[in-house]
Regions:
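Arginine residue identity/basic-tract feature
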Residues: 1, 38, 108-112, 116, ...
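Extended, H/D-rich, highly charged conserved domains that either
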Residues: 1-117
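Generic recognition of flexible, low-complexity loop/linker segments
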Residues: 40-43, 65, 120-128, 155-157
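SIR2/sirtuin-family catalytic core signature
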Residues: 124-230
Length: 230
């Protein structure tokens, strides 16, 4: 465990140096975040909206200009520079393994005191599924198994199968090289498929689990979209 702590400390120092020496990083973060946050966002005097961010990044520059509204929240779930940062494995199949549990992100988050994540999503209500979060946007995450437990909790919270929650997955768009866009779309599509297949297998109704992605597509609730990063 001491070796893991040393690695986290060394990585924190490296990342802090990279952020400090990259003069354009802050402005790029702001521009890029605002492009994604505003994409497809409804507005109007009679429409209330709030935004929450679950960041798997260890930097907090976006939080400096984040405005999520009264019900919004910004959470660096694995810590951030200047404090304790967390590396670890997913706890889904490890919480009963005494040799592995202390290396899971779940255990290490608990040991750190946890994070206030109650405002990240609006959960679905069985009597009114429209209460659930309208849109969940993803960018820059591999969607790999290391963070699967977070996605499962979010999808359960919004009752993904029955609600109207839309999933939007973004990839870096190149307006010159279409082959790069195709490569990004293919890779992202495979990752989304793996994520939704894994999640579908946890649903009580196994038929619902098998056709989850098909249902999302038919209802216009599964979207891939390119976004320019320059």
């Amino acid at each position: 465990r001491q070796e893991l702590l040393k690695l986290e400390h060394a990585f924190g120092e490296y990342l802090a140096h990279e952020v400090e020496t990259n003069e354009s990083y802050a402005e790029k973060c702001k521009t890029f975040y605002q492009a994604i946050e505003r994409d497809g966002k409804k507005s109007g005097d009679d429409y209330y909206s709030s935004t929450s961010v679950l960041s798997f990044n260890y930097t907090d520059l976006i939080e400096q200009f984040f405005d999520g509204g009264e019900d919004g929240a910004f959470v660096n779930i694995h810590g951030k520079l200047g404090g304790e940062i967390i590396f670890g494995i997913d706890g889904k199949d490890c919480m009963d393994n005494p040799n592995a549990v202390s290396f899971t992100k779940t255990f290490r988050l608990m040991r750190r005191g946890g994070s206030r994540t109650d405002k990240l999503i609006r959960t679905a209500n069985s009597s009114n599924l429209q209460d659930a979060t309208d849109v969940i946007k993803f960018y820059g995450h591999s969607l790999g198994k290391a963070d699967y437990s977070y996605f499962q909790s979010i999808f359960d919270g919004v009752d993904l199968y029955e609600s109207k929650t839309v999933l939007v997955f973004y990839y870096p768009y190149d307006d010159v090289d279409e082959s790069k866009n195709e490569e990004w779309r293919n890779g992202l599509s495979n990752s989304i498929n793996d994520l939704l297949v894994d999640y579908g297998s946890t649903l009580d109704n196994k038929d619902h689990g098998k056709n989850l992605m098909h249902k999302l597509l038919l209802e216009g609730r599964l979207i891939l979209r390119g976004v320019q990063i320059d």
